[in-house]
A protein has these predicted regions:
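Extended beta-strand/beta-hairpin segments
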Residues: 2-70, 77-156
Length: 156
C-alpha cells in the first residue's frame, strides 16, 4: 500500500482517485509465477497458473490476464449497477465482458490493453451511454488503469 503522505502532488492535473479510507484488503500469494499457483489468504482462491498457448505455454491453468479480465468485468458491472440504481434504472439482465490482451511495449517490457463489452438490453442507447460513462468514473479498475493502459468500452 502506498503511504499517501509520501506521494507528491501538484504537478499532475489528474483527479486524485486514491481511497480516503480502505474498506477491504484482498491478499493473494503467487508461487512460481506463470508456471505455478496462486492462493488467497481467505482460501477462496487456489488456482494453477500456466502460460497460455499463444505465449508458448500449455494453457493448463489460469493466467493473470484471465484474472484481470474477471476482476475488471465484475468491478465495472458493479459500478454500472450502482450508477444505474442511483439514476433510477433497473439493470437486471445487463452484462459486462472483458477482454485483456498482453504484448510487448516500447520500453522492452509488456503492456495490457482492455476491451469491455457492455450489454444493457432494456435501456435506451443514449441513457446507456451516459450510465457507462458514469460507471467508468466510479469503477476502481477504471480509475487504476486510466491514462495508463488502453481501455475501450463497447456498448452493444
Amino acid at each position: 500500500m502506498t503511504d499517501h503522505a509520501a506521494v507528491e502532488t501538484g504537478a499532475d492535473s489528474r483527479p486524485d482517485t486514491r481511497p480516503t479510507k480502505i474498506m477491504y484488503v484482498a491478499e493473494a500469494t503467487a508461487h512460481g509465477g506463470r508456471s505455478g499457483y496462486i492462493t488467497s489468504q481467505d482460501g477462496q482462491i487456489d488456482l494453477k497458473v500456466a502460460m497460455p498457448p499463444a505465449m508458448g505455454g500449455d494453457g493448463d491453468g489460469t493466467n493473470p490476464e484471465q484474472l484481470f479480465a474477471a476482476g475488471y468485468s465484475s468491478c465495472f458491472h458493479n459500478a454500472l449497477v450502482l450508477v444505474g440504481r442511483r439514476a433510477g434504472y433497473d439493470l437486471t439482465g445487463s452484462t459486462v465482458a472483458a477482454k485483456v490482451g498482453i504484448g510487448p511495449n516500447k520500453q522492452r517490457g509488456y503492456g495490457l490493453a482492455v476491451a469491455l463489452s457492455v450489454s444493457l438490453p432494456v435501456i435506451d442507447q443514449e441513457i446507456a451511454a451516459k450510465l457507462v460513462d458514469a460507471a467508468h468514473q466510479v469503477c476502481p479498475y477504471s480509475n487504476a488503469t486510466r491514462d495508463n493502459i488502453e481501455v475501450t468500452i463497447l456498448l452493444g
